Amino acid sequence: MSDEQNFSRIQREEVEGAPPVASGAALRQRRLTETVTLNRYLYRQSQHLEHMLLDAVELQSLLEVLLVSLPRHFSFRVAELWLYDPDKDLARIIVGGERYGHYLQLHQDAFAMQELYGLEPDIEWIDATDSRMFEVLKSEYGISSALMLPLLESGRLVGSLHLGTEEKNFILGDEEEDLLAHLAAMISCCFKLAVTRQQVSQLIMLDPLTQVGNL
């Protein structure tokens, strides 16, 4: 038998032994199943994160959730938090913030934060081709893309949470965007409550005459 005949026979056997090609309907059904599975996973993870946020009643606990627990929870490599602090009020009430280093940044000028978003701040997914990658997570190596969540108070930008990943191609569907928008709104609300609680706590501990701490 010639080499050409042998090759033809091998090709025919491989084709006959190959699994059947999935139809278009089967492929669509498989993609739908995968999407539903992913959405259920994200929903469960989001519910768990919501419970962690609600349990973090103290400002320090909330920072720990945002900068340590949240990236681990969603398999991001790192998290970075920018906060608008024009009067240094946050600097006075955040205890132990230095432990987070450059991952927690207090900005007296809102310009740098506003430059990250459009006129109406919304969730942004940026990659290495975006110039904003030179502004966020600057000290991190190997980060290929970042998710940016704007933190708003009455429509005003008061913070920006950045989550870095090594994934290069990441597509957000409508359901994922809605879920992230909900989480961003919840983080903003929890942050406002935690700041207010911390400020009240410090006022209670101040002597009304000397404004010196009682403890």
Model-derived features with residue positions:
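Short, low-complexity N-terminal regulatory "tails/caps" that precede and couple sensory modules
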Residues: 1-41
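Regulatory sensory and allosteric helical modules in signal-transduction proteins
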Residues: 98-139
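Conserved nucleotide-binding and Mg2+-coordinating catalytic segments in signaling enzymes
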Residues: 202-215
